[in-house]
Amino acid sequence: SVGFKAGVKEYKLTYYTPEYQTKDTDILAAFRVTPQPGVPPEEAGAAVAAESSTGTWTTVWTDGLTSLDRYKGRCYRIERVVGEKDQYIAYVAYPLDLFEEGSVTNMFTSIVGNVFGFKALRALRLEDLRVPTAYIKTFQGPPHGIQVERDKLNKYGRPLLGCTIKPKLGLSAKNYGRAVYECLRGGLDFTKDDENVNSQPFMRWRDRFLFCAEALFKAQTETGEIKGHYLNATAGTCEEMMKRAIFARELGVPIVMHDYLTGGFTANTSLAHYCRDNGLLLHIHRAMHAVIDRQKNHGMHFRVLAKALRMSGGDHIHAGTVVGKLEGERDITLGFVDLLRDDFVEQDRSRGIYFTQDWVSLPGVLPVASGGIHVWHMPALTEIFGDDSVLQFGGGTLGHPWGNAPGAVANRVALEACVKPRNEGRDLAREGNEIIREACKWSPELAAACEVWKEIVFNFAAVDVLDK
């Protein structure tokens, strides 16, 4: 009979559907699945589809009160990962009606919620998501985007330069503001609060905001260029975060900052909406990302977190460097950098992109390269990231032997020295060091910086590598 039959049945009988034709409105996910010994890959893939959509561990009679066929996730393809023992890529399609409009929070609660603790799997990693255009149109996305930011700043044809103020913790507000002034006066476009600078006993947020605003307006007046300092509005409550953003707007500064993973997607989306409505740019730091994305077989790849940020909203986001001290393999990094900036990105497994992604009219996000970079890296960074990026030197500015302002001068000279020959068709990858040495002849600040950092390398193999 067709009636309700209690008991446990295999997931694959309901949720593994290799004949399924995906729809344009489906959210598609690529999971790296490592099943427990004895669990067939089809059952593991179907279990992921079930537990992240309508399924549970046993048959329930209330299944009969809805149309499971309409709402269930479906594992529609499974591929073995070459060169890895017992690893598979399981492709899952989710009907769009499973998700609340305009909510990254709800999307992740479903797709990467309970399923990651599932016992039948040894490990599970979400490698990529295809977000359909119908769902993307329910998001505001970045407050302003790349072109609007360039127009606000009146800066074109080159990457933007930033610097994280160090030591990251312990400075008083006035000394902090002084460092901001010196860096901006020396030629940088932005300075930055470190991600863990919120409102601590040694420097309360309001004092920092006031001294940083004074510093950037003074530097602006003296250089004739528009300057910014990423004022970190991240706080313990959403209300406090909004209070800080409102105060920044009242000071007339151009940009605020948020730690979007520790702060949470709900808070981030609220802040992004406020920033668009009030003309503030929004810089996003990815603190905590490596907890989620560092392991190759478990967690979630950063390209998914990057896509989620573009939907939730941010004008800049940290994206690794390829050449500095933090993780970032070149092809993979450029894959998600394109996902942040471009309107349309083709599927390309050689860059880790599992699905073609159409962003329709959602503005782009500027990738920020930061972490252990200095003047010798400038040719490579200019070559790899191109104009639409922010190159952020913390120690690579403030560690200059002559002080902060000369450190900023060295970075600006190195950047201008790389952009000009690149525009003339010279090969920065091959001639980069020679170009920097040439520029040292007419910039003593750059020459001093080159001398200090000539031996520094971070030679470690990347953890995040492509499958064979």
Swiss-Prot record:
Top EC group: lyase
Gene Ontology CC entries for this record: chloroplast
SUPFAM superfamilies linked to this entry: RuBisCo, C-terminal domain, RuBisCO, large subunit, small (N-terminal) domain
Residues that, per the record, bind Mg(2+): 192, 194-195
GO molecular function, one term: ribulose-bisphosphate carboxylase activity
Co-factor binding details: Binds 1 Mg(2+) ion per subunit.
Catalytic machinery residues: 166, 285
Binding-site list for substrate: 114, 164, 168, 286, 318, 370
Extra remark beyond the main annotation: The basic functional RuBisCO is composed of a large chain homodimer in a 'head-to-tail' conformation. In form I RuBisCO this homodimer is arranged in a barrel-like tetramer with the small subunits forming a tetrameric 'cap' on each end of the 'barrel'.
Protein name per Swiss-Prot or TrEMBL: Ribulose bisphosphate carboxylase large chain
Upper classification of the organism: Eukaryota, Viridiplantae, Streptophyta, Embryophyta, Tracheophyta
